Amino acid sequence: MAINLKRALLLSVSSATLAALLPITAISNADTLPSFKPIARGALSNDSIYFVMTDRFENGNTNNDDAGIPGGVEVNGLDKKDIGYFHGGDFSGLTSRLSYIRDLGFTSIWITPPVVQNWIQIGSAAYHGYWGIDFTTVDPHLGTESEFKAMVSRAHELGLKVIVDIVANHTGDIIKNSYGMYNYVSLDMAPYKDSRGRVFELDKFIGKQNFPKLDVKKSFPRPPVVSKVNKNIKKPAFLNDLTNYHNRGDSTFSGESSIYGDFFGLDDLFTEKPEVVKGMIKLWSSWITKFDIDGYRIDTAKHVNPEFWNAFIPKIMETARKAGKKDFGIFGEVYDANPYMLSTFVQEQSFPSVLDFGFQRHGLAFAKTDGQVPRLIDLFNQDDLYTTATQSAYGMPTFLGNHDMGRVGSFIHSATYGDEELTLRRSMLANDVLFFSRGAPVLYYGDEKGMVGDSGDKAARQDMFPTEVVEWQEEYRIGSSPIGLRSSFDVINPLQIQITQINELIARNPALRKGTQQLRKTSRSAIAFSRYLDGQEFLVILNSSEDSDTLDIPVTTDSSWEQIYGGNAKFSVAGKMVSITVPAISTVVLKAKSTFTAKDKISVNLAKIDYDFSTPNWLALRATVPGDEFVQVNFQARVKGSGKWGNVGTSDRRTFETDEVKGGLHRVFLTPRKFKSGTTIEVIAIARNENNEIAYSKVREFKITY
């Protein structure tokens, strides 16, 4: 029996019944009902990540502290008393502490770039790993390739993934120019020229094999030069070709210079050239096959042209799959807190995920002071922006501080005006926000030890092993005393105990890590949300106020509840309503004592398709399902008249009502440029409840124009 989808009313049947009623052979290609696709949570959705700066973590071999090159700090970059130079941490030391990370409850480690560095530049050393010059092997300050492989092997034995920080935007600062001037020169002022001195439009040749041949003396505003000693210092060899760099001067971090300018003087790669694209794919594919690593964090992603990522990332993922890495995690550093900006890297630039700078801003704001709940609501309502057929916000690495901006403890200590007790309480609340909210939480090493630092960058990169930096010996620590000459590994901190307990709780209750997150109820300073997976509902309530707060919270599971985390909280249950008083600056987690089964008849309505005011370049696909039971709504689209449906993405939770957002919506967003302008598309919504019952919406049409 053929079904005309345009006239189809809502179907509500189980998957098995649907298969029986609609045999494939009886349906024409144009009218085939698509199969439901569940939400894709992403490779990192079940992970918690411990971020290590290798040089500052543990010194396992003092023989490599100077990289085997004697001669002092200006030669080898070693100065253990200066926060801007190498201190001696290495792979051997990290290997010896992997069990410590495992025992904290983490599932992955992320390490700073391990490649060979341009050791000294601009009055500092490359201990951090972001000034690479030989990307084919490891820096001798950190150890040998065999020691790196041993670290990865030991991590795998302990059940830890190894995520490596990589850079595709730039290399260390080796290239100068014949004028000795480094202010940015715009394309309008001096466009690129080919090797014969003819101007060409860069946009017309990005990534294409007919990219014009360039000449060092004729193609750039200021001819690049390099010293004889550094002529072949970089590896792979294509990095020594001076025409493989933009050579336009220092970025102003605005306009075109954000892509084409040198990042603080670092040599900016000409990632529009196919030679560079091919070289980078080969380079970073080799690290997967050679060292057996499990993921990449990609530095300075926003400063590289989108075409590069759309070529690079699929090839890297292909290499990982061939190497048996089905869950190879990739996330980009896009230093921007706006979800509309961040999500473009997922929707339009092939990134599986990005670091959640929006969470960093709003999660931190919630933890360090009261009255910030609306910002968290807006953040979580925007999670739909990241939903695709293969990814969602559940796989985004979340964090509250890092090696660049500074430690979360520094932000909180400043906000509490140095009140030590309040700083500890709010730091514990910050951990609750980080670990119980959706996403893959990232803890910056030392945060569990109460490290603070008086600012970002160098000041936030303390030694975990006994430090020779006097100011770090004397520095205030949350929940503890100054470290002095001791190793941080020898001091137990209340934050460390708390984090271990949270990770243990989540390991026993995986819904708290990878389950659906549904906002339930808020007040000025408290927020409550359900975490749900496989019939089990949990309720997380966080209160940032210095006073207790009482909430009446609707839930889906008609059950009695038990408290599994937090201080003394009074709560009562009446049907599907939990009334609870949460103590000041604290968190409570409740667990339903019985599992949930669907009772409502399922149906789904697909709203009119249109551009959303908040995302003028994307189509908003919105659907509603009556009631408040846990359902997933899958959206699929196809070119009108074709038989093949394509999965757009799946929503597993409803929007929360605000002044700007209508509540109760299941949403995903479609990027129109995946279709040719003038194309009419058809869209259908498919809902599935906990009983695996399926409902189909009517099909809606939309004509793509741009």
Outline where the language-model segments fall:
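Carbohydrate-interacting/catalytic domains
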Residues: A2-F51, D66-I69, H87, S92-T95, ...
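Active-site-proximal helices and loops of the catalytic beta/alpha 8
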Residues: L33, H170, Y179, S186, ...
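Substrate-binding/active-site clefts of carbohydrate-active enzymes
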Residues: R41-D47, D55-S286, K290-F291, F312-R321, ...
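Structural recognition of the beta-strand scaffold that forms the well-ordered cores
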Residues: S48-M53, S108-P113, D134-T136, K161-D165, ...
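Short, flexible loop/turn elements at secondary-structure junctions
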Residues: M53-R56, V115, D139-L142, A168-H170, ...
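Short, solvent-exposed loop/turn elements at domain surfaces
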Residues: F57-D66, G406-G409, W472-E474
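Active-site clefts of carbohydrate-active enzymes
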Residues: S392-E420
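Long, low-complexity serine/threonine/glycine- and acidic-rich segments characteristic of extracellular
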Residues: K608-Y706
